[in-house]
């Protein structure tokens, strides 16, 4: 637990409790075969269709990676002969879908709809023109804004974890940065 961020821990715990244990809880690890894994993969695909849509391939990959890491741990430390997840093969896709961004034309059509909503208008202006993430925007404080240099200091992020508002460090050191605000935003 201490080696990962709290949000990561919560995500892993959720996957184990809702996606892995319901299927595998009555099985002994050493008796689980690649065939069992393939049946679980099929049940994951079916479950996502029953819920009105399909899980994203990257989410399925994340769920399977969690299962595989549990088996890897057993192979490494408890003499399990092999990892049946590796033998069974991939469940989800390994590349995420390309991110979609508004063109300037699309944004310019949208932003007038926020004209009477001052806070929303400013939020969208910062998000679009500065290219910051929503969690970074929500974590900004007045001390992070320098109007003399027209910069934002991005040093933290907002997350909602288990119903609580939490300010966290960014995931990576590269996420800590200074962002220049265009004049249109700084005014």
Task: State the predicted function of each range.
Residues 89-90, 106-108, 139-187:
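Conserved tyrosine-mediated DNA breakage-rejoining catalytic core shared by Y-recombinases
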């Amino acid at each position: 637990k201490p080696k990962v961020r709290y949000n990561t821990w919560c995500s892993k715990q959720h996957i184990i409790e809702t996606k892995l244990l319901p299927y595998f809880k009555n099985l002994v690890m050493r008796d689980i075969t690649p065939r069992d894994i393939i049946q679980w993969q099929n049940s994951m695909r079916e479950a996502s269709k029953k819920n009105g849509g399909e899980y994203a391939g990257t989410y399925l990959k994340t769920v399977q990676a969690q299962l595989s890491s549990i088996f890897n741990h057993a192979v490494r430390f408890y003499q399990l002969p092999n990892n049946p997840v590796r033998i069974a093969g991939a469940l989800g896709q390994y590349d995420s879908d390309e991110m979609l961004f508004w063109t300037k034309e699309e944004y310019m059509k949208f932003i007038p709809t926020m004209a009477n909503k001052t806070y929303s208008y400013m939020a969208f202006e910062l998000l679009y023109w500065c290219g910051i993430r929503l969690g970074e925007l929500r974590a900004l404080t007045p001390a992070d804004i320098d109007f003399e240099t027209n910069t934002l200091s991005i040093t933290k992020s907002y997350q909602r974890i288990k119903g609580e508002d939490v300010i966290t460090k960014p995931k990576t050191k590269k996420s800590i940065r200074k962002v220049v605000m265009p004049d249109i935003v700084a005014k």
